[in-house]
């Protein structure tokens, strides 16, 4: 394991007690998306899923990503339809990955096929860049400047 790889610890999904946070994205092809997150970020596919109703679950570092093909309203969300982004340049939310060495991550993930919008740029106390996934979602990759801590 090198400095940009993540050691997959045991994080329970579903949690045995309390709760955990998972990020859900609507995708055009469940397997394609699961394989992308596995290849680029070293994610561990817990359940591959399919386009016939089974979501995919991928562990990435200390969180989970759920990929699913979407669909129309259901009994528990009667007015909501899930769909992939119509315009990948207009977003309302995105995944944010915090890293210890952005330049090493940029080079590694680019070598694995990640499509970066730009190279890393300094802004607001951090250096960051963005990746597009196969459905057009953007993923921010950021490294906080030395000396800044949260929490």
Segments the model singles out, each with a brief description of its role:
Residues 27-30, 51:
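Conserved beta-strand-loop-alpha-helix junction that forms the acyl-donor binding cleft
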Residues 32-33, 101, 105:
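Short phosphate-engaging motifs
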Residues 27, 96-99:
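Short, solvent-exposed loop/helix junctions and linker helices
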Residues 33-38, 109, 136:
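Conserved active-site tyrosine of GNAT-family acetyltransferases
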Residues 140-141:
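Short glycine-/small-residue motifs
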Residues 1-22, 44-97, 104-132, 144-151:
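Vicinal oxygen chelate
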């Amino acid at each position: 394991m090198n400095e940009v790889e993540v050691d997959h610890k045991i994080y329970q999904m579903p949690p045995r007690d309390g709760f955990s946070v998972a990020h859900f994205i609507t995708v055009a092809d469940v397997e394609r998306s699961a394989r992308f997150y596995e290849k680029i970020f070293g994610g561990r596919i817990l359940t591959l899923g399919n386009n016939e109703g089974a979501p995919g679950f991928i562990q990435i570092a200390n969180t989970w990503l759920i990929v699913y093909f979407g669909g129309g309203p259901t009994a528990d969300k009667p007015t909501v339809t899930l769909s992939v982004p119509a315009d990948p340049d207009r977003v309302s939310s995105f995944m944010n990955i915090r890293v210890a060495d952005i330049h090493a991550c940029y080079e590694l993930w680019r070598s694995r096929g990640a499509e970066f919008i730009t190279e890393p740029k300094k802004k607001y106390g951090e250096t960051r860049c963005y990746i597009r996934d196969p459905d057009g979602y953007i993923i921010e990759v950021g490294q906080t400047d030395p000396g800044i801590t949260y929490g």
